[in-house]
Amino acid sequence: MLLGVNIDHIAVLRQARMVNDPDLLEAAFIVARHGDQITLHVREDRRHAQDFDLENIIKFCKSPVNLECALNDEILNLALKLKPHRVTLVPEKREELTTEGGLCLNHAKLKQSIEKLHNANIEVSLFINPSLEDIEKSKILKAQFIELHTGHYANLHNALFSNISHTAFALKELNQDKKTLQAQFEKELQNLELCAKKGLELGLKVAAGHGLNYKNVKPVVKIKEICELNIGQSIVARSVFTGLQNAILEMKELIKR
């Protein structure tokens, strides 16, 4: 299984003081040595990663670069110019802390944007909710890759197997008894497996990501149809204590098959 390391949260730390430290390019070099892919989300408001980050990483790093972006003309034109290995199209809301759900596949610009990226020999992935309907639509839209949103799975795992329900970070909608949460968790994991199988049957390559960490990743790794995970915040958080290289290697060990 391949590991794409999302380095957005290193950019978050840099932007907190609006200086050039930590150096995102240095982080990209470490990911290039120890991970399989560099993933970077350039948002419409440029709150974290900047255009020059993407340009430098593509120019100086040998690893594949997976650009996450919304259906924004300015950023899509940047992608067409710089030509990352892959563009993963994601939904985006300015007020959100992180990507909250999968992409709406009925967007009028989506088909045209995919065609433009394909014409530039850029692989296209769609970040989607784990639903059979969205997988079938992704195939019709001629995406090569889908990335299944694992946020709900991760939230359920957190509610079941951590103390988050007793903290300020508890999710009100998951304030339920353990038996109910366990049933929902098992159902969501089964749904991820079903969706991954459907994607592979349709000839799509299947990735997964969002909220995955060192404690919840193992059940997802067992879904053999998933070939790649994109993980960011948990690896960067771990790197504060272990260093980025070790944090990546620890995750690589966990996702070995």
From Swiss-Prot:
Site label Transition state stabilizer, positions: 147
Q: Which residues bind 3-amino-2-oxopropyl phosphate?
A: 6, 17, 211, 232-233
UniProt entry tagged with the keyword Cell cycle = no
Which reactions fall under this protein's catalytic activity? Answer: 3-amino-2-oxopropyl phosphate + 1-deoxy-D-xylulose 5-phosphate = pyridoxine 5'-phosphate + phosphate + 2 H2O + H(+)
Name where it's found. Cytoplasm
Give the keywords, sorted: Cytoplasm, Pyridoxine biosynthesis, Transferase
Transferase listed as a keyword: yes
Task: Return the Pfam families for the record.
Answer: PdxJ
Pathway participation: Cofactor biosynthesis; pyridoxine 5'-phosphate biosynthesis; pyridoxine 5'-phosphate from D-erythrose 4-phosphate: step 5/5
Q: Which GO terms describe its biological process?
A: pyridoxine biosynthetic process
The job of this chain, per UniProt, is described as:
Catalyzes the complicated ring closure reaction between the two acyclic compounds 1-deoxy-D-xylulose-5-phosphate (DXP) and 3-amino-2-oxopropyl phosphate (1-amino-acetone-3-phosphate or AAP) to form pyridoxine 5'-phosphate (PNP) and inorganic phosphate.
Membership in a protein family: Belongs to the PNP synthase family.
According to the record's subunit comment, the protein's assembly and interactions are: Homooctamer; tetramer of dimers.
* Protein name per UniProt: Pyridoxine 5'-phosphate synthase
